[in-house]
């Protein structure tokens, strides 16, 4: 089975949220909602971390001021030559 996308997870989470407001959720649906939320947060964090690790920061003078921690991660992943 393919890994669900953030959009598909969010759509189902929203369906369950709407149902919870109108009719309430069964125990199975509550467990599904909790599982979907955890999956969504995991994917969100992975995506955000990847974006931060790929980022380079420059000041107004054009000098790179990327934090050393990020630079080291980039070096470890082979994304930097310096």
Curated annotation (Swiss-Prot):
Q: Which domain of life is it from?
A: Bacteria
A Pfam family it matches: DUF896
Q: Which InterPro entries match?
A: DUF896
Q: Does the keyword Nucleotide-binding apply?
A: no
| Cellular component aspect of the GO annotation | cytoplasm
Cellular localisation: Cytoplasm
| Similarity field | Belongs to the UPF0291 family.
The molecule here is called UPF0291 protein LVIS_1359
**Source organism of this protein record:** Levilactobacillus brevis (strain ATCC 367 / BCRC 12310 / CIP 105137 / JCM 1170 / LMG 11437 / NCIMB 947 / NCTC 947)
């Amino acid at each position: 089975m393919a890994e669900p996308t953030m959009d598909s997870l969010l759509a189902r989470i929203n369906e369950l949220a709407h149902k919870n407001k109108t009719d309430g959720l069964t125990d199975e649906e509550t467990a599904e909602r909790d599982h979907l939320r955890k999956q969504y947060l995991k994917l969100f964090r992975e995506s955000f971390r990847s974006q931060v690790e790929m980022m380079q920061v420059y000041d107004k003078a054009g000098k790179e001021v990327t934090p050393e921690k990020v630079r080291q991660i980039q070096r470890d992943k082979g994304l930097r030559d310096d």
